Amino acid sequence: MSPEIIDSSDRYSLKPLVGSLLSKIDELLDQNKALLARIAELEAKLGTPPKTPDNSSLPPSKGQKANTTEPATGKKQRRKGHPGVARALCPNPDATRDIFAVRCACGVPVLPADQVLAHAYDHVDLPPIKPVTTRINLHRAQCPCCNKTVTAKPPTDMAPGSPFGPGIVSIAAYLHGCQMVSYNRLVEVFDGLLGLKISEGAIANMLARLAKPFAVVADKIAAIVRNSPVIASDETSARVCGKTWWQWLFASASAVYHTIVPTRGKCVPVEFLGGIRPKVWISDRLAAQCTHAEAHQFCLAHLIRDAQYAIDAGDDIFAPGFKAFLQKACVIGRKRADLADATIAGHARTLKRELDRLLDLVPKQLDGRRLRDAIEVTARDKLLVFLTRRDVEPTNNVSERGLRPSVIFRKVTNGFRSGWGAAVYADLCSIVATGRIHHRSPLASIRAAIAV
């Protein structure tokens, strides 16, 4: 509005104009206040430390790589020696060849009865790999009594349908699920290494038929884990049909169960437990992992990284002492096998007093204050459960190690194109991981599951 219009207006016409201008000023002041708050928030973010593998769950592969140091240009230092290591002799060789000396260098013959063992070594080789094809001929005849046709039944170990036996199926499942070999490369491996012509479709059909026997074994594994007193759990993302799903792991001392589902919510462990309440649950601080057991042990390794992030952000009151407290607790946890119960109880009392002292501190830095408040509210009774039971670990490394192959599988294969593929892979992970606990090779575990 031009000044001339304002000068020519009387006071009655200016009153609504002034009111609208005051309203506009209030609106602009509110907008300015919101923008200033947003600027302060962004400036605060600029001052936060970057996420690294040491202060967050960022994997080491995504961390900053330090430059390698140039080798010193002088006299090369001698490497410290170490005892030599040789392959041990096989305790049960498949065959033995006794080689006797024939004659001395002077020409005199040497009798075998006069010779003693001078040296023994193993020669290991593979026989020629060739598929064995068995033709099944089912015969029939007319019953001489009732004149009905009687046809021979096929053998149970060589049923009609797919021509490929459990040896081929187990190798395909192992190479694809454990070694991340694609269907295309599996065709080349079977042809070039095993001398077997097979198509990608046949491989897919093989794996699809494994759904039923694998599910039977996986259900038994789930029951073992479900009824265990101590359960560790973790989850990682999975790609199914182009969408983000979640692979959950539930581990006990004698079995490991995997499942791939569309959600990361609390409904997954609730459905898995089916009303059973274990003694102790080990996990990170994810809300979906809480309130499933009588006691809960938080992973101290996760909390050490959280404390390190608060230290990097500038907290020098709570986070440094809390990190030292967690590291001391982990050291005691690793030494429990050599400690008496009374000694462990003494360490528990000392650590509880130290935790009380730390929680009485009042950090001024925002991240340190958030960490301290979170520990005070949700984690105070979930840090030292491992000192009350020897079968409880202070960290959840068993779950992270169990999910690591699945993370590599996801990166190599880019996920699953079908729901049944994800289900078969989860059951395969359960079978292989449980077999390793009982000192069985992955291939042996797969073959045993197929035979069910």
What are the language-model segments listed below?
Residues 11, 136-452:
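Catalytic center-proximal scaffold of phosphoryl-transfer enzymes
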Residues 1-162, 232-233, 283:
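Short, flexible loop/hinge motifs at secondary-structure junctions
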